[in-house]
């Protein structure tokens, strides 16, 4: 298959979406699929929208670009939209509506958590053709190598993520 991932991949630390795109591309290539980060090939089988906001530095293409591709290049290309963002995590009031509109250009939706899926469902997004795929961890980074048990006295380190409104 020829698959395009809508991310401008950055080298170095750039957030979970960037890591997701890198790891997905690696997995797909290891399984003999061709991966692109643009809409240049005229025979794409699948397009993954990861960031439809054209003002985002990580966006390789928008839902509007995908619409033009389907209208003028290849109409039977499947489109999947990965939703990893919401207003609730940053106390904004425009992201959800924008992503819900962008989602109308997709055939299928992948949410990064049940929480975010339910959030969009409650706001009116049709989640019939969707699933939740939780992020995996890079075992080269997240492992028990060098693990030191907590001594009960030192500060506890807590890691959190924006898959909830608990900020």
Model-derived regions: residue spans:
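Acidic anion/phosphate-binding donor-loop and adjacent secondary structure
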Residues: 91-93, 121, 136-155
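Conserved donor-binding/catalytic core segment of Leloir-type glycosyltransferases
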Residues: 149-167
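N-terminal pre-catalytic "stem/leader" segment of glycosyltransferase-like enzymes
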Residues: 1-55
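Extended catalytic core of nucleotide-activated donor transferases of GT-like folds
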Residues: 32, 36-105, 115
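Nucleotide donor/acceptor-binding cores
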Residues: 1, 77, 154-157
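A short, active-site helix/loop in glycosyltransferases that binds the activated sugar's phosphate group
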Residues: 104-129, 137-142
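A short beta-strand/loop micro-motif in the catalytic core of glycosyltransferases
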Residues: 47-48, 105-114, 131, 159-161, ...
